[in-house]
C-alpha cells in the first residue's frame, strides 16, 4: 500500500531523555577531565546528532571553544586530543546513560498507536554501540522496545548526516520503499540523515536538544518562554529541511495521517 510502513526514531531527545541531557553533560565533564578545559552546555549542544567522536571534533572548531583551547595550549585541537577526550567521554557515558533511559511522555502510547496501524519501529543514534548496549535494555525495562536499532559506529560508511543508519533500518525491517519511511529527530544532523535517505522527516522542537530543558523545567515554564524556545528550535529544524516540526513524538500519528494523504495523491518526500 502507498502509505507509511516504518518510522526511524532517534533516541536521546526523541524517545528517551527529555532535553537530551545525557550526552551534553558528559561532553562538559569529558573536556574537563581530559584537559581541564571548560565548555558550556550550550556549546555542547551545537553539534548534537553527530557521532560522538565527530561531535568532539566539531566542538573543537567552535570559535569560542577554539579560542579557549588556543589560549591554553597555543594550538588548535588535534586528532590525538579528540581521541583523549573521547576516551574520557566513553566510560562516563556508559556509566550514566542508564539514568537517562526513561521514555519521554507520550512515547509508549505513540508506539502502540503506530504498531496498531502496522507501522514498524526502527531507530538509530549518535551513541556508539558500547553505549547503546546499556541504553537499549534499560529503555526496554521502561517499556520502549523498537523493532531494530543501529549505533553510530556500526557501519563502515559512518553515521549522520549520511543516510546509512536510516537505510540499514530499511533493510533490517524489510521496507519496500524509502518514501514509505519517516525519520524523526530532534537535531539537524538527524534531519539531514532522513533527507539523504530519501525519507519524510519530522523534527521535534520541544522534547529535544534545541529546546534544551528538563521535563521538570518545561512543566514550570511560562507560555512566553516555551513559545520563544519552541520557535528557536523549530527554526533550526526547518532550516535543516524538516518536512514537519512538532513538539514531541506524541504528535507523530497526526503527522503520519497527513503524510499518508500526500502519498495517496502521488506526492513523494
Curated annotation (Swiss-Prot):
Binding site for Mg(2+): 10, 12, 186
Cofactor: Mg(2+)
Highest taxon of source: Bacteria
GO terms, molecular function: magnesium ion binding; phosphoglycolate phosphatase activity; phosphonoacetaldehyde hydrolase activity
KW Metal-binding (keyword) present: yes
Enzymatic class: hydrolase
Entries under SUPFAM superfamilies matching the protein: HAD-like
Active site per UniProt: 10 (nucleophile), 52 (schiff-base intermediate with substrate)
EC code(s) of this entry: 3.11.1.1
HAMAP family assigned: PhnX
Similarity comment: Belongs to the HAD-like hydrolase superfamily. PhnX family.
Protein name: Phosphonoacetaldehyde hydrolase
Lineage: Bacteria, Pseudomonadati, Pseudomonadota, Gammaproteobacteria, Enterobacterales
Gene that produces this protein: phnX
Amino acid at each position: 500500500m502507498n502509505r507509511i510502513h516504518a518510522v526511524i526514531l532517534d533516541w536521546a531527545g526523541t524517545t528517551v531523555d527529555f532535553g537530551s541531557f545525557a550526552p551534553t553533560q558528559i561532553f562538559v565533564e569529558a573536556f574537563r577531565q581530559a584537559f581541564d578545559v571548560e565548555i558550556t552546555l550550550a556549546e555542547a549542544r551545537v553539534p548534537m546528532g553527530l557521532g560522538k567522536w565527530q561531535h568532539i571534533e566539531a566542538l573543537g572548531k567552535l570559535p569560542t571553544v577554539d579560542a579557549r583551547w588556543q589560549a591554553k595550549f597555543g594550538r588548535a585541537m588535534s586528532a590525538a586530543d579528540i581521541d583523549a577526550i573521547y576516551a574520557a567521554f566513553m566510560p562516563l557515558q556508559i556509566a550514566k546513560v542508564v539514568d537517562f533511559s526513561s521514555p519521554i511522555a507520550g512515547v509508549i502510547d505513540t508506539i502502540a498507536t503506530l504498531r496498531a496501524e502496522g507501522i514498524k519501529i526502527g531507530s538509530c543514534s549518535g551513541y556508539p554501540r558500547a553505549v547503546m548496549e546499556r541504553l537499549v535494555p534499560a529503555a526496554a525495562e521502561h517499556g520502549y522496545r523498537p523493532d531494530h536499532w543501529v549505533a553510530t559506529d556500526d557501519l563502515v560508511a559512518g553515521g549522520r548526516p549520511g543516510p546509512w543508519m536510516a537505510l540499514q533500518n530499511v533493510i533490517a525491517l524489510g521496507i519496500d520503499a524509502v518514501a514509505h519511511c519517516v525519520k524523526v529527530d530532534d537535531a539537524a544532523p538527524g534531519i539531514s540523515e532522513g533527507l539523504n535517505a530519501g525519507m519524510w522527516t519530522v523534527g521535534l522542537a520541544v522534547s529535544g536538544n534545541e529546546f534544551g530543558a528538563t521535563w521538570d523545567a518545561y512543566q514550570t515554564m511560562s507560555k512566553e518562554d516555551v513559545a520563544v524556545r519552541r520557535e528557536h528550535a523549530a527554526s533550526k529544524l526547518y532550516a535543516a529541511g524538516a518536512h514537519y516540526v512538532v513538539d514531541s513524538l506524541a504528535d507523530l500519528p497526526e503527522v503520519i495521517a497527513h503524510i499518508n494523504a500526500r502519498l495517496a495523491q502521488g506526492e513523494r518526500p
